[in-house]
Every structure is written in structure tokens, then in C-alpha cells.
């Protein structure tokens, strides 16, 4: 078992807190020293009280799911002796009412595009299986109720990459 944490800091300064006219911008700090500007989403709290240039919790949630999946996929591919040259994804989360009628991130769709090289290339079926296994192992996906879909995009770098699955 391991513990994971972060630090958050928000300061009111001279802002009109009681009048609900305060910035939602804050800082996230992680154990390696990385600091990221964070804010509420402008879809939830209008600008200028939110900062569209900062990471919002919804984006961070989608990114955490995609990052966890990526790391598991790379590990699985390496164990299976498939050389991954690149992995790109543009995950998309959908905020909607869940079965309890509450706003929630109800679906996150990953669209990974992986390029391989070497004499041993995975078939599209093997790529799909590695994505399935990565999803099953992902700590973040195993921690949430959100439906997480994986729709791999095939390009050059898989055996028989012209095959549609």
C-alpha cells in the first residue's frame, strides 16, 4: 500500500468572497515539485472567476485516466516484446447526469494511437487485447464509476494495419 498526495493553495487576497466574486484559480503542487495552475472550469464558473488557461478538475480527471492507461499499455507492450515508438491520445470526457441525477463525468473515451517498430509487430487484435489489459490494470479506472472506453486508432506500425476491427 502507498499513499499519494498533493498540495493545494488558494488565497482570497482582496477579493469579494462573500459576494461570490472571487477567483477560483489556485495552485496544485506535486511531490516532485511541479506546480500547476488550476481553476474551476469556465463551463461551470464563468470567466473572470475561473481561469480558462488553468487546468480544471474535469480535465485533470480525464488526463489521469488517460495517463494511467498509457503507463499500463507501455508496460504490457514491453513485457510482450513489442517496441513502442510513440503513443498519442486525445481523451474526451462527457459531463452529464448520472443514474442518480447528479452531474458527473459519465464517460471518458480514450483514443490512443500507438506506433510500433521492429521485426515483431503486434496485430490489431493484439493491440486491442493490450488496451483491454491496460484498462483492467489501471488503478484510476478501477477507482471510478465512470465508464471508460478505449477506441484505439490504427496507423502504420502494426502488423496488418490495413485490417479494420
Task: List the predicted regions and their residue ranges.
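Extended beta-strand/beta-hairpin segments
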Residues: 1-63, 71-165
Amino acid at each position: 500500500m502507498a499513499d499519494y498526495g498533493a498540495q493545494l493553495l488558494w488565497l482570497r487576497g482582496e477579493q469579494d468572497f462573500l459576494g461570490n466574486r472571487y477567483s477560483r484559480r489556485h495552485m496544485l503542487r506535486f511531490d516532485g515539485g511541479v506546480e500547476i495552475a488550476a481553476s474551476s472550469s469556465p463551463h461551470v464558473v464563468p470567466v473572470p472567476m475561473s481561469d480558462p488557461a488553468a487546468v480544471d478538475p474535469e480535465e485533470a480527471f480525464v488526463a489521469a485516466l488517460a495517463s494511467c492507461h498509457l503507463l499500463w499499455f507501455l508496460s504490457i507492450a514491453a513485457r510482450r516484446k513489442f517496441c513502442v515508438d510513440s503513443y498519442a491520445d486525445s481523451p474526451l470526457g462527457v459531463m452529464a447526469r448520472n443514474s442518480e441525477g447528479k452531474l458527473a463525468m459519465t464517460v471518458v473515451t480514450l483514443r490512443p494511437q500507438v506506433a510500433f517498430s521492429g521485426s515483431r509487430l503486434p496485430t490489431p487484435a493484439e493491440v486491442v487485447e493490450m488496451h483491454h489489459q491496460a484498462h483492467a490494470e489501471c488503478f484510476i479506472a478501477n477507482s471510478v464509476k465512470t465508464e471508460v472506453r478505449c477506441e484505439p486508432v490504427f496507423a502504420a506500425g502494426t502488423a496488418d494495419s490495413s485490417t479494420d476491427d
